[in-house]
């Protein structure tokens, strides 16, 4: 796992948690929760790849891991669309920078999860 990605996640989550977007703050908390969930999922896939013989363990623990993987990609696509929408609608430069970095991070995480999953297949 790349330490820059971990610090990027922590930085963006911290920034998003400090944003006050009025009535949409509940939506933002949901996005933050999904970011955290994706980070944990990506980390668990990365650990499984590091152990390389762990595919059978992963399949036994979660017989529907491919279905779960598909759901994670759907979550990523949804988050990307949400972040893009917020980026278009906000005029606050701090929020724009944060959402641009969040978007970049989502693309990186999507690529990492895709790479990990191909190694496990």
From Swiss-Prot:
Keywords noted in UniProt: Host nucleus, Host-virus interaction, Transport, Virion
InterPro entries per UniProt: Flu_NS2
Major place of residence: virion
Xref: SUPFAM superfamilies: Nonstructural protein ns2, Nep, M1-binding domain
Record Pfam families: Flu_NS2
Keyword Transport included in the entry's annotation: yes
CC annotations in GO: host cell nucleus; virion component
Placement of sequence motif Nuclear export signal: 12-21, 85-94
HAMAP family named in the record: INFV_NEP (MF_04067)
More info: Average number present in a viral particle is estimated to be 130-200 molecules.
UniProt similarity note: Belongs to the influenza viruses NEP family.
Known function: Mediates the nuclear export of encapsidated genomic RNAs (ribonucleoproteins, RNPs). Acts as an adapter between viral RNPs complexes and the nuclear export machinery of the cell. Possesses no intrinsic RNA-binding activity, but includes a C-terminal M1-binding domain. This domain is believed to allow recognition of RNPs bound to the protein M1.
Subunit structure and binding partners: Interacts with protein M1. May interact with host nucleoporin RAB/HRB and exportin XPO1/CRM1.
Protein name (database record): Nuclear export protein
Protein's organism: Influenza A virus (strain A/Wa-182)
Organismal lineage: Viruses, Riboviria, Orthornavirae, Negarnaviricota, Polyploviricotina
């Amino acid at each position: 796992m790349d330490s820059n990605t971990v610090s990027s996640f922590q930085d963006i989550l911290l920034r998003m948690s400090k944003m006050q977007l009025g009535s949409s703050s509940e939506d933002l908390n949901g996005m933050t929760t999904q970011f955290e969930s994706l980070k944990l999922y990506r980390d668990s896939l990365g650990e499984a790849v590091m152990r390389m013989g762990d595919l059978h363990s992963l399949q036994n623990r979660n017989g529907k891991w491919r279905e779960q993987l598909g759901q994670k990609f759907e979550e990523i696509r949804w988050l990307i669309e949400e972040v893009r929408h917020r980026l278009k609608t906000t005029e606050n430069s701090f929020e724009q920078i944060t959402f641009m970095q969040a978007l970049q991070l989502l693309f990186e995480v999507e690529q990492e999860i895709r790479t990990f999953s191909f190694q496990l297949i």
